[in-house]
Amino acid sequence: DLCNYGYWRLFDKSWTQLDFYNYGKFLNDNLRKYPEKSIISLSDKKNEKIKLGFLSSDLKGDHSVSYFLKTVLRNYNQNQFEIIIFNNHKEDKISQELTNLINKIIHIGKLSDLEAFNNIRKYNLDVMIDIMGYTSRNRIELFKNKIAKKQIIWMGYCNTTGLTNMDYIITDPNLVLKNEKKHYVEKVLYLPDIWNCHCGFDIKREENPSPLIKNKYVTFGSFNNPAKINENVINCWSNILKRVKNSKLIIKCADKRRKLDRIQEVFKKNGLQDSVIFHHRIDNLEDHLNLYKKIDIALDTFPYNGVTTSFE
C-alpha cells in the first residue's frame, strides 16, 4: 500500500524531512479526487457548539491510541464542544467505553470511501482530526477531498501528510524542528511540552525490586515494534551488552518471523545470540505490563523512538 509506505519510512534513518514532504505531495497529487456531482456540499450553517470529529481505525482492543485519546475525551469543555468519533473498525468494548465520554460514535468500517465521505459531511463538522495518517487501514483519501471545514492531523502519524487540504498538524518542538517547518504542508501547532498524554492503566500497581538483586546481572529490555530495530540499533545495543558483563537483553515483539529472523541474525553476527531473550506477542495487557518487572533498564530505538512503549 503506497499510503503505508510513508509510515514505514519513519523508521528509516536515510529519509530526510524533505523526502517526507515530497512523498506527501506525490500522494496529494495522486489520491482520488471525488467528482463534485457525487458528493454532498460542505454546509455553511453555524453550529451551536464547535462540532469536532475524530477519525480512527485503531479504537479497538488494547490498541494504544485509545489510551492517548481518553485524556482529551475526559477533559474537554462540554459546553463548547460536541464530539463525534468516526470509527473505522467494528464496535467492541473500547468503542462502547468511549461512547460514555462523548456525544456519539459512528461506525464507518463497512462503508466505501465515497459512502463514508458523504456520511461524514452530513454532520457539518467544524473540525475533523485524523489520528491515523498513513498507518494501516487509513482513510486519508477523505481528507484529500475535505470532509470538514478545518482538518487536523494528530497522533497516529507524526509527519506531514502533504495534503493541501490538511490545515494543521498538532505536535511539539521535539517532533517538528523549527528549521524543518518549511517542509510541512500543514500549519504547525505546537503544544508547549509534549504532543500527547497517556491516560495510564487501571491495574494494581506494585513496586518490585530490581531484577539485578536476584539475578546478579543487568537485564536490558525493549518492547518496541520490531520494525524500529534496525541494524544501527542492534549494533548499538550489542556494544552495550559487551560492555556490561554478563548482561542480558529481553526483546518482546509480535510474531513476525521475517523481522525476528533479521534481528537474530545480526545479534548472532555480533556473537551475542546467547545474550538476547525473545518474548513473542502477549495478548493480555496485565501480563504484558508485568514483563517489565524482569527488566532493569529499558533501551530505546532510533531514529524513531518508543512512544507507547516509553510511556509504559
Residue ranges and their predicted role:
Residues 237, 299:
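Hydrophobic, well-ordered secondary-structure elements that form the walls
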Residues 227-231:
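A short, basic/aromatic alpha-helical/loop segment that forms part
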Residues 80-82, 238-269, 273-274:
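A conserved nucleotide-sugar
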Residues 142, 240, 312:
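Hydrophobic/aromatic ligand-binding patch that stacks against planar heteroaromatic rings
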Residues 1-217, 225, 235, 265, ...:
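Alpha-helical solenoid repeat scaffolds of the TPR/TPR-like class and their adjacent stem/linker regions
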Residues 132, 300-304:
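Short Ser/Thr-rich beta->loop micro-motif in glycosyltransferases that lines
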